[in-house]
């Protein structure tokens, strides 16, 4: 009886071992298959830009830059799936739906803010807008551009670096005004005063005269000349001669002026400041990111003028490499799109290649060509460098 029981136990053990072996082999097979599926699965990033119509030059430059980024990353699983928005809001929604149907959850674009209007319908898709505006964006849109907050933060750092204590802020009465005001509130930058000005040049000069107390300083000069003329002071003729070479007399109650403007409007404001005898030699001229606009270097009367911006060395290298490959120069937005591809890949990698809308919620930093990206709670900001345009060149301060 004992031998019979032993044989039964032995047979049971043999069967159990075979069952366990079968289960282990099956599990290994499943794991290998699952791994193979994930290994073969493509990481698709959508790209929605204007590839036809008035702005096709911008879109095609962005597309080429993203392909350049893909080549740099050198991962065959990562692909860009582009679509033409025609710079139209309804077309933007249509092509975004097509990308969503392909299983794409992250889309770079659109370029222009007007094309964001319908995108909130696609709640499971995260859009990385190439715009630099943050206010009133749909909940699933993250601005990837060099926004006002990033720029004002850099200016605040420059204030501390240069011991600037009495800045006035000049803001144009434009759509960008609310972005600047929001950035000022969030960064808590130290300002002596803030003024909104009209972009119409015929109105602008009179506004700048009032801001700088030009009439009072002009009157001070006239009064002092008259006083000397009626006085018995020694060398009064020489003193009068020196005063007559001046435009105004009296101090300025600020040590720097932050001009939140660009291109010709920026130059108009600076010219009005010069007219009112407030030169960049008397106060610091500070402005926003000018993307190293070389026309500023020609305006010697405005120099030195300080501004936050991207990493110039990296930008110059990108422009050179882009030109060598495509035999044309890129636009500025294409440099941003190059970095956004790298940013998305970095965040997906950090999230174990799981693509969901949480990857932009976690606090992270990414060192791109532009500079350092800060990601937190579905917002992107940039740690910018600071430059001065002076003596026909752009010089890095920090």
Each language-model region and where it sits:
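Extracellular/periplasmic periplasmic-binding protein-like sensory domains
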Residues: 189, 210-222, 228-237, 252-256, ...
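Beta-alpha junction/loop-to-helix N-cap segments that form part of ligand/metal-binding clefts
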Residues: 42, 57-62, 75-137, 143-146
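Short, solvent-exposed amphipathic alpha-helices that sit
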Residues: 57-73, 91, 175-192, 207
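Structural motif
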Residues: 78-100, 151-154, 200-214, 236-243
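Segments of small-molecule ligand-sensing domains
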Residues: 327-338, 343-394
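Extracytoplasmic ligand/sensor domains, especially the bilobed periplasmic-binding protein
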Residues: 106-170, 175-183, 189, 194
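Classical Sec-dependent N-terminal signal peptides that target proteins to the secretory pathway
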Residues: 17-39
């Amino acid at each position: 009886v004992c031998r019979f029981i032993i044989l039964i136990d032995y047979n049971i053990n043999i069967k159990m071992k075979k069952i366990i072996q079968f289960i282990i082999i099956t599990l290994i097979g499943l794991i290998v298959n699952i791994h193979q599926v994930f290994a073969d699965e493509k990481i698709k990033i959508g790209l929605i830009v204007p590839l036809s119509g008035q702005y096709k030059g911008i879109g095609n430059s962005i597309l080429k830059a993203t392909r350049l980024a893909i080549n740099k990353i050198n991962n065959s699983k990562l692909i860009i799936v582009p679509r033409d928005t025609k710079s139209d809001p309804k077309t933007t929604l249509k092509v975004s739906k097509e990308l969503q149907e392909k299983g794409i959850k992250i889309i770079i674009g659109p370029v222009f803010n007007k094309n964001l209007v319908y995108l909130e319908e696609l709640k499971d898709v995260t859009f990385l807008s190439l715009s630099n505006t943050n206010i009133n964006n749909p909940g699933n849109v993250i601005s990837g551009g060099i926004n006002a907050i990033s720029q004002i933060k850099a200016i605040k750092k420059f204030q501390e670096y240069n011991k600037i204590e009495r800045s006035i802020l000049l803001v144009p009465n434009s759509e960008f005004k609310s972005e600047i005001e929001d950035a000022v509130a969030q960064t808590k930058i130290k300002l002596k005063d803030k003024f909104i000005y009209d972009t119409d040049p015929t109105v602008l000069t009179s506004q700048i005269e009032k801001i700088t107390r030009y009439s009072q300083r002009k009157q001070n000069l006239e009064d002092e000349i008259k006083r000397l003329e009626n006085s018995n002071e020694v060398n009064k003729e020489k003193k009068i001669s020196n005063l007559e070479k001046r435009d105004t007399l009296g101090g300025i109650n600020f040590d720097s002026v932050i001009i939140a403007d660009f291109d010709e409007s920026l130059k108009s404001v600076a010219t009005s400041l010069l007219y009112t005898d407030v030169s960049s030699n008397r106060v610091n001229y500070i402005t926003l990111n000018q993307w190293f606009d070389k026309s500023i270097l020609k305006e010697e009367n405005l120099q030195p003028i300080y501004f936050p911006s991207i990493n110039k060395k990296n930008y110059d290298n990108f422009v050179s490499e882009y030109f060598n490959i495509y035999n044309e120069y890129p636009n500025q937005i294409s440099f941003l799109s190059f970095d956004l591809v790298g940013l998305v890949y970095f965040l997906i990698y950090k999230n174990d290649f799981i693509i969901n809308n949480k990857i932009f919620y976690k606090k992270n930093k990414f060192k791109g060509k532009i500079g350092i990206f800060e990601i937190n709670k579905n917002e992107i900001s940039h740690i910018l460098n600071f430059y001065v345009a002076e003596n026909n060149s752009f010089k890095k301060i920090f």
